[in-house]
A protein has these predicted regions:
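Flexible, glycine-rich phosphate/dinucleotide-binding loops
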Residues: 26, 50, 125
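Long, intrinsically disordered, low-complexity segments
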Residues: 1-6, 42, 57-170
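Extracytoplasmic/secretory soluble proteins
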Residues: 39, 43-47, 51, 104
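Short, glycine/acidic-rich hinge or "gate" loops at secondary-structure transitions
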Residues: 29-33, 51-59
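C-terminal substrate/ligand-recognition segments
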Residues: 1-43
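Enrichment for repetitive, rod-forming helical segments
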Residues: 15, 23, 49, 109, ...
C-alpha cells in the first residue's frame, strides 16, 4: 500500500549528530563525531571539492545563516511601498548551523516544520517555528498555539487502546 516507511542513512547520521551536540558528546564519543557525520553526508554533494564538505563543531553549534523574514504585500502587487518586510537573522538559534544542514539535506522531505519546533532560540524556551518570521508567517502577529507542536493521535489508535488519551487541544 502507500504507508511505506521511508528512512535515509543521512537521517540516522543527523539524528546521532544532533544528540551528540545537545549532550556535549556521549558514551566516549565527542562532539567531533557529530561534525564527522555531517561531513560524511555532505561529501556526497561536494565530490568535486571535498574541502567544501567539511564542517566543524563550531559551525554546527553556531547560529543559522538564514535571514529569517516575512514579506507581505499590503496593496497592489509590484509596488515597493506596499510591502511589509520583517527580516531578522538566525544567529540566536541554538545549533543553528545544524538546523541549516537539516534544511539543505531534507528539502521537500517534510522535515522542516518539526525541525523548527524542536530547535530553540538561545536563552529562551521559544521554538524557531513561533519565534522567527518566515515565508508568510510574521512571528510578531501570527502565533501558533503551542498545542500544535505535537500532532493529534489518530482515531484508530484511540479506538484500539482505551488507555490512550488524546493529546491536549485536540
Amino acid at each position: 500500500y502507500d504507508d511505506v516507511p521511508f528512512f535515509r542513512l543521512a537521517d540516522a547520521y543527523f539524528i546521532k549528530a544532533e544528540c551528540l551536540l545537545r549532550l556535549g558528546g556521549y558514551n566516549g564519543e565527542s562532539e567531533q563525531v557529530a561534525a564527522d557525520l555531517v561531513t560524511a553526508v555532505r561529501q556526497r554533494a561536494f565530490k568535486s571539492d571535498p574541502g567544501k564538505a567539511t564542517v566543524t563543531v563550531a559551525q554546527l553549534k553556531g547560529g543559522s545563516r538564514y535571514n529569517y523574514g516575512h514579506r507581505e504585500n499590503q496593496g497592489i502587487m509590484g509596488e515597493a511601498d506596499n510591502w511589509i518586510i520583517t527580516e531578522e537573522g538566525g544567529d540566536d538559534i541554538e545549533l543553528g548551523g545544524l538546523l541549516d544542514e537539516l534544511a539543505w539535506e531534507f528539502v521537500a522531505e517534510h522535515h522542516r516544520r518539526q525541525d523548527l519546533i524542536r530547535f530553540r532560540i538561545n536563552g529562551t524556551n521559544q521554538n524557531v517555528y513561533n519565534g522567527k518570521s518566515w515565508f508568510c508567517k510574521d512571528a510578531k502577529t501570527d502565533k501558533t498555539d503551542r498545542h500544535c507542536d505535537i500532532f493529534p493521535l489518530p482515531k484508530s489508535a484511540l479506538d484500539g487502546n482505551i488507555k490512550l488519551k488524546q493529546n491536549p487541544g485536540y
